[in-house]
Amino acid sequence: MTLEPGTTIEDTRRLESGMTRREIVALFKRRQEAYEDLDAKTLAGDYTDASVIESPSAGVHTGRDAEKALGAIFDAFLDLTMTVDDLVIDGDVVVAILSFEGTHMRPLLGFEPTGKRFHLSGAFVHRLKDRKIIHERRVYDFTGLLVQIGVLKAKPA
């Protein structure tokens, strides 16, 4: 087998997900672009009907219902940006270390827009199978986001 420069055997080995490491990296690059385009439909297309998505802000969703939850976030933060700071791939488990920024421009979960910006870091833990995300656990400080956009007050420590 001839490899492109900079490519390792590990990059080309298919995992249980049916994907190579290189394909997994491409999937998450495409997901980052979909976040930047506020494209909930493309993001939801990476899930199966039985996928489980757990989120501090939206609760637990099954399947492509995640599109509705993402749509609500995208509607509230029209300038939302997401950056993949690091991607850790261990077999069919992928952890994306992420940074988010945006401005609260429209209602969110019943809170009127404040016009305030937020910056948030977090990690999304994904399990892949058959080229799809079958489980996603989002870990981030949702309370901190609410404080930053001014809809929740916090007392100094």
Across the structure, where does each feature detected by a protein language model lie?
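Exposed beta-sheet edge and beta->alpha loop/turn motif
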Residues: G102-D130
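Short beta-strand edge/turn micro-motifs at domain boundaries
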Residues: T2-P5, V95, H119-I149
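Residue-level signal for pocket-adjacent positions within structured domains
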Residues: E10, T48, T103-R106, P113, ...
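Short, low-complexity N-terminal intrinsically disordered segments enriched in polar/charged residues
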Residues: M1-D49, V60, A154-A157
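A solvent-exposed, acidic/Ser-Thr-rich amphipathic alpha-helical stretch
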Residues: R21-V25, K29, A40-V94, L98-E101
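Conserved functional loop/turn residues at catalytic and ligand-binding sites
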Residues: D39, T81, K132, G150
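Juxtamembrane/interface motifs at transmembrane-helix termini
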Residues: G63-A66, R117, A154-A157
